[in-house]
């Protein structure tokens, strides 16, 4: 016998799907005879249409919205842009019929799939000079309110760039990199762009490529109306200058311009630095100063992450307590030692730990 509380599990679960029908709308006259919805096309092939005009009324998606056409809750298709109605098939969606709006009368749909979209920007040429100047100088409200602050920051950046250019010119002469005035005019913007790319997170090779590509495109835009031979001469000079700078100069991890160091030399210097650091045991101020002195030139051949990793490894604020276990006898509290109290959760007692001051980097 089965208990009365047992209930049979249904084999099928019916879920209601809400459709855009008269019954779903909750009308008082639902299920009664009423006027038809006047379904069908409202605009035909090639007819002009305006924004919001209905092109097709339908039950279900007999036709799908194509270019510049939207679809409503009841599957009504309407124009999103003014243009000309097109009924078409799309080879990328076989079995579906589309209705679109072409922006121009002589343009058929579908447009080539892998080409840029055809868009209308809705702009007209302003022939009045005064109105054209006013429109050109017009600013959005947010930018207008921040205009003074933006101009001030822009001027500060320009001053900073000029200071860097003067500094780089001096470094180039100190390192005896042979550049004439014409080459220097390309070298300084190249170095500024190189530094900016490194500051924004580019690696060395990407920063160099981006700097050269940026100056190359800028040069092509400036000289687009001049003779091709002059442009080719300038591009050749830019290539020579960038190659010379890449082989003679570099930036360290503090974004300072220094002499170029090859990857092989950097690996050798890094290995030598690690060997020297392992040989020094920090026990007093002198040994601490020795370790800090080793990091003086490390910025020139180590990346910032490598330098931070080595500093954390060899300049630990507090040495691990495992070194206390190596002592034969525990240390006693004194002026040369530091005593800390710590609660022992296993034994419910307070442990008194005495450590030498040399275990704490800040106490040296």
Swiss-Prot record:
Molecular function GO labels: structural constituent of ribosome
Keywords, alphabetical: Mitochondrion, Ribonucleoprotein, Ribosomal protein, Transit peptide
Keyword Electron transport set for record: no
Keyword Ribonucleoprotein included in the entry's annotation: yes
GO cellular component, as recorded: mitochondrial large ribosomal subunit
One Pfam family cited in the UniProt record for this chain: Ribosomal_L27_C
Family label: Belongs to the bacterial ribosomal protein bL27 family.
Function of the molecule: Component of the large subunit of mitochondrial ribosome.
Protein name as catalogued: Large ribosomal subunit protein bL27m
Organism of provenance: Kluyveromyces lactis (strain ATCC 8585 / CBS 2359 / DSM 70799 / NBRC 1267 / NRRL Y-1140 / WM37)
